[in-house]
């Protein structure tokens, strides 16, 4: 009868030990990979373009006053003709000019103003010019004093905005793809430089945010708005996270 070998427990112990070593190595590599995946750099890339407004909106408010409402209305009609003639003389197409709603104020209907001196009826009107020739609109707006010299009584008010024409850039979608590509490329350049400085290698993208497009005035100064300038700056900032290896 053959006796059981005493070597069997030794073999089992060796197998278990080797298994633990292999498992420990796998776990170690797992922790190493986890730490590596947590290493990343967040960078920003900026792209800018100078753009010229391609649309102008110019509200021209005016007013007439008289004790006779019919005469006040007649003055409004005459003023409308003068304004249109002025715009045509500046080389502008008035086919896109529209009249806003007519507003009439009867001062005698207001008990707080009934005793004040002045014309009874005040008629307000606004002519809104829409033009795809912003440069001509700007030039015409700088000669608005000629209308005053011709007897036109210009008005103002919060409903008409800050005064003067508004210049808009409407072709943003045409330049978006190229600007996003440029911003992303600059972000990658910054990340690559960081990786070199950190003696690491640049990995793939962890997360990306293209940012929001903003339109700014080209010449920034107190009291100067973007909508009041022909020349503008379009800017986008892309934020990208890259893994480091």
PLM regions with names:
Residues 2-245:
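Short, charged, surface-exposed interaction patches
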């Amino acid at each position: 009868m053959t006796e059981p070998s005493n070597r069997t427990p030794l073999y089992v112990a060796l197998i278990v030990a080797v298994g633990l070593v292999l498992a420990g190595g796998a776990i170690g590599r797992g922790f190493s990979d986890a730490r590596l995946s947590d290493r990343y750099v967040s960078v920003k890339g900026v792209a800018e373009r100078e753009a010229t407004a391609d649309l102008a909106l110019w509200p021209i408010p005016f007013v007439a006053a008289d004790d006779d409402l019919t005469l006040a209305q007649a003055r409004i009609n005459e003023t409308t003709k003068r304004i249109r003639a002025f715009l045509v003389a500046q080389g502008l197409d008035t086919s896109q000019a529209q009249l806003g709603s007519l507003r009439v104020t009867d001062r005698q209907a207001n008990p707080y103003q009934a005793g004040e001196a002045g014309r009874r009826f005040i008629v307000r009107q606004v002519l809104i010019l829409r033009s795809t020739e912003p440069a001509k609109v700007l030039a015409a707006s700088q000669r608005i004093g000629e209308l005053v010299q011709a007897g036109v009584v210009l008005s103002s008010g919060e409903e008409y905005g800050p005064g003067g024409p508004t210049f808009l850039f409407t072709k943003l979608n045409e330049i978006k793809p190229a600007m996003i590509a440029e911003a992303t490329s600059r972000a990658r350049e910054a990340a690559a430089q960081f990786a070199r400085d950190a003696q690491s290698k640049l990995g793939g993208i962890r997360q990306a945010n293209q940012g929001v497009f903003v339109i700014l005035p080209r010449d920034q100064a107190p009291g100067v708005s973007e909508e009041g300038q022909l020349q503008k700056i379009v800017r986008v900032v892309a934020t990208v996270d890259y893994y480091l290896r």
